[in-house]
Amino acid sequence: MKLSLFSTFAAVIIGALALPQGPGGGGGSVTCPGGQSTSNSQCCVWFDVLDDLQTNFYQGSKCESPVRKILRIVFHDAIGFSPALTAAGQFGGGGADGSIIAHSNIELAFPANGGLTDTIEALRAVGINHGVSFGDLIQFATAVGMSNCPGSPRLEFLTGRSNSSQPSPPSLIPGPGNTVTAILDRMGDAGFSPDEVVDLLAAHSLASQEGLNSAIFRSPLDSTPQVFDTQFYIETLLKGTTQPGPSLGFAEELSPFPGEFRMRSDALLARDSRTACRWQSMTSSNEVMGQRYRAAMAKMSVLGFDRNALTDCSDVIPSAVSNNAAPVIPGGLTVDDIEVSCPSEPFPEIATASGPLPSLAPAP
């Protein structure tokens, strides 16, 4: 059942903060055919999907390129949602409805969705084979994929989205070449505050680029692209001094050390007066970063839907391995290399790593 976006947000945040953090499949009152325990019989099918994804799609539960692709897909699918278009009498998009798979012939032609065809087709096959909706599958695959990356929060997973959808309107996906105002306006239309935009960008902790500069294919956005941690927020604030490729790519800025790619939109958001203090607050605590990202993702996952009409199957989601490493300023650099942009708060005390300036390899 579709519902107004704004009528569900309070329940979303409460639900996200109350999520269990234990292992998947435990503590439920229903025993599935495979012997797993869960809270609701509607969740049993997802154990089969879990095994399929981890074995085949994630190639043995790895935190590699398929995880980064699903993080793009989950955002690009859900953000196709515009109350402003609806108010103007146009179709505003269905939100997290799986339309990027159902209508891939249209949505994969959007410039922002370049390079996703193979991943979309692999997900389509999984959805059809297991008889689950594409909207549910995208959310589930995202939560499972992140569980393969140390330090990741255990995301909420709600099932029950219909497989009925329409193609998303074009031009609703904010991109790396947009201004901060354009990004905040687009995200604000979908119901997200500037703080929540910064929170959602925690996904870039696991990110690399493929289509912005082909000469440095899969160059990561931080020094730990297989760990969900605050390094992305720290390193985006470092002074840009290095051109990692033979020339700068589309929407690329100078980076702090060889091999790291810096998106222009990230650099701008880290330094803009509307977002800089929230950005700085994400640098020093992996726990805070995870909590905020989980809440923002829970909100995004129900864009266009009534969360009360969905079934909570979060207990199927595995828990990621903990990340106990403290945030650091990379070797060869100091706090003096940070471009502090929040005037109201001092920059947190963060240790400096020993050793030379990093030189990063492409992300796997």
Swiss-Prot record:
Active site: 76 (proton acceptor)
Annotated disulfide bonds: 32-44, 43-313, 63-149, 277-342
GO BP terms in the entry: cellular response to oxidative stress; hydrogen peroxide catabolic process; response to reactive oxygen species
Glycosylation, residue list: 163
Cofactor(s), names only, from the UniProt record: Ca(2+); heme b
Catalytic reaction annotation: 2 a phenolic donor + H2O2 = 2 a phenolic radical donor + 2 H2O
EC number in record: 1.11.1.7
Signal keyword on record: yes
Annotated family: Belongs to the peroxidase family. Ligninase subfamily.
Protein name: Peroxidase
Source species of the chain: Arthromyces ramosus
